[in-house]
Regions:
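Residue-level signature of mid-helix packing/kink "hotspots" within the transmembrane helices
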Residues: 36, 64-72, 157-158, 255-263, ...
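Extracytoplasmic gate region of multi-pass secondary transporters
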Residues: 38-39, 211-252, 259
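Conserved MFS/SLC helix-loop-helix module at the cytosolic interface between two early adjacent transmembrane helices
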Residues: 69-105
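Helix-to-loop junctions at the C-terminal end of transmembrane segments
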Residues: 70-82, 261-274
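Helix-loop-helix hairpin linking two adjacent transmembrane segments in secondary transporters
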Residues: 110, 148-192
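Cytoplasmic helix-loop-helix junction between adjacent transmembrane helices
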Residues: 114-152
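C-terminal transmembrane helical hairpin of 12-TM major facilitator-type secondary transporters
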Residues: 275-320
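A late C-terminal transmembrane helix in Major Facilitator Superfamily
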Residues: 330-363, 370
C-alpha cells in the first residue's frame, strides 16, 4: 500500500509526541466512556430499568447508528474548526451525558433518549484525536501514537469493568455515571492547546474513496462483533454462572490485553514500510478463535477466549486508522470519517443481532455467529487492501507520466 511521506508536522515548536498521544488517549477515553460504562453496568441497569439483553443491544445499536449518521458531517466540522476546540466540546459533552444518565435515567426509554442525544460526542472525540495525531506527530512515531490513542477504547472498558465491583455493587450504578462525568471533565486538561498546521493539500482523487468504503464495510463487520464483546461480556459471564464481580474483572482483563496489543501493533507498524491492512486481516482471522471459545462452557475457556478476542479481534482499529491517515495526510479527519461510518454502522447492527440471538438462542450461539462474521470481515479487508494497492499503482503511474511530460 502506498503511503504519503509527510503525514505529520515535524515543527520543533510543536508539543512532544508523548504529550500529544497522551492527550489523544484521554480525550478518546472520555468520549467513548458513556456507552461502555452502560454495557458494564448492564446487569444493574436491567434490574432497575426492566430490560433484557435484546434491550441492551437496541440501545447500544441506536447509539452507534446515530454515530454513523454523524460521522461524515462531524469529520468536516473537525477539519474546519480544528482539534483544539472540538476536543473540548467532545469531552464536555460526554461529561454532561454521564451526569444526565446519573440523574435522569429513571426508565429504559430515558436511558435510550439520553444516550442518543450524546452519541455525537464519541464521534467528535475520535476524529479530533485523529486530526491532532496526524498534524502533530512525526511520521516515524505515528504508528505507535495511533496505537496508544486507540488503546483508549480498552481503557474505557477497563474503567467500566472496574466500576462494577468498585462502585456499582457498593454504592450503585448512578454513582458510577457520576464519577465518569467528573473524569470526563478532568480530561479538559489533556486537550490540545493549539491547532497544528495542516499538511499540503492534494487532489481529491488521491483519497481512494472506493477502497476506503470497502475497508469501512469490513471494519463495520468487525466492529459489530467487537462492540458486542465490550457490551455483552459481563452479562454473558453472569449467565453462565460467574459472579458479577468476577465477570467485571474478566472485562478488565480483556481491556488490559487489548490496550497492550494495540500499542504493540502501533510500535511494530513504525518498523514496517507497509502491509498494515494485511496485518489487520490476520488479526481479525485469529481473533475469531477467541469468540468461538467464549461459546465454550467453563472458566478456562472464558479466560482464554477473552484474551484472544480482545488481544486479536479488537486490537486492529489503531493500526487501520494509521494506515488511512498515512494515505490521506491532507484530510485525515475526513478520510477516517469514511471508515468510521462503517465502524459505527457495525456498532449499530452488531448489538441488535447479538442481543436478539442471545435472547432467543442463547449466548453460545451468539458468540459463534460473531466468530463467523469476524472471519468474513478479514476476507473483505483483504479485498480492500487489493483495491488500495491498485489505487497506489495508478497514482504512481500518473505521477510518472506528469514528471515525464
Amino acid at each position: 500500500m502506498s503511503i504519503a511521506t509527510e503525514p505529520g508536522t515535524t515543527d520543533t515548536a510543536s508539543p512532544s509526541a508523548f504529550r500529544v498521544a497522551t492527550g489523544a488517549v484521554v480525550v478518546t477515553t472520555a468520549s467513548v466512556l458513556p456507552v461502555f460504562l452502560t454495557g458494564a453496568l448492564s446487569v444493574q441497569l436491567s434490574r432497575d430499568l426492566a430490560f433484557d439483553p435484546s434491550g441492551l443491544g437496541l440501545v447500544v445499536a441506536l447509539y452507534f447508528g446515530v454515530s454513523a449518521l454523524c460521522s461524515l458531517p462531524v469529520g468536516v466540522v473537525v477539519e474546519r474548526v480544528g482539534s483544539r476546540v472540538t476536543s473540548r466540546i467532545a469531552v464536555v459533552g460526554a461529561a454532561v451525558l454521564m451526569a444526565a444518565l446519573a440523574l435522569g435515567a429513571r426508565s429504559y426509554v430515558a436511558l435510550v433518549v439520553l444516550l442518543l442525544c450524546g452519541a455525537w460526542c464519541n464521534v467528535m472525540g475520535q476524529l479530533s484525536s485523529n486530526l491532532t495525531l496526524a498534524r502533530s506527530v512525526p511520521a516515524h512515531r505515528m504508528g505507535l501514537s495511533f496505537g496508544v490513542k486507540q488503546a483508549a477504547i480498552p481503557a474505557a472498558t477497563l474503567l467500566a469493568g472496574l466500576a462494577v465491583p468498585a462502585v456499582a455493587l457498593t454504592v450503585g450504578w448512578r454513582c458510577a455515571y457520576g464519577i465518569g462525568a467528573l473524569l470526563a471533565l478532568a480530561a479538559l486538561f489533556a486537550c490540545p492547546r493549539t491547532d497544528a498546521r495542516p499538511a499540503a493539500r492534494t487532489g481529491s482523487g488521491d483519497r481512494a474513496t472506493a477502497a476506503l468504503a470497502v475497508i469501512g464495510a469490513a471494519s463495520g463487520l468487525a466492529a459489530g462483533t467487537a462492540t458486542a464483546l465490550g457490551i455483552f461480556l459481563v452479562a454473558s459471564a453472569v449467565d453462565r454462572g460467574i459472579d458479577p464481580g468476577l465477570a467485571g474483572l474478566m472485562l478488565t482483563l480483556g481491556s488490559v490485553v487489548g490496550l497492550s496489543v494495540r500499542m504493540l501493533h502501533g510500535w511494530l507498524a513504525d518498523m514496517r514500510s507497509g502491509g498494515h491492512v494485511a496485518v489487520v486481516a490476520g488479526s481479525l482471522a485469529a481473533g475469531a478463535g477467541g469468540f468461538l471459545l467464549l461459546a465454550v462452557p467453563g472458566t478456562p475457556a472464558l479466560v482464554v477466549g477473552v484474551v484472544l478476542a480482545f488481544g486479536l479481534g479488537w486490537a486492529w482499529p489503531g493500526l487501520l486508522q494509521f494506515a488511512v491517515v498515512r494515505l490521506n495526510p491532507s484530510a485525515p479527519a475526513a478520510a477516517t470519517s469514511i471508515v468510521q461510518v462503517g465502524v459505527y454502522a457495525g456498532g449499530f447492527a452488531g448489538p441488535i443481532v447479538f442481543g436478539s440471538l442471545a435472547t432467543h438462542a442463547g449466548f453460545p450461539a451468539a458468540w459463534t455467529v460473531n466468530a463467523v462474521v469476524m472471519l468474513v470481515s478479514a476476507a473483505l479487508m483483504l479485498v480492500g487492501r487489493r483495491m488500495l494497492l491498485a489505487h497506489a499503482r495508478r497514482r504512481t503511474e500518473s505521477g510518472r507520466r506528469l514528471s515525464g511530460s
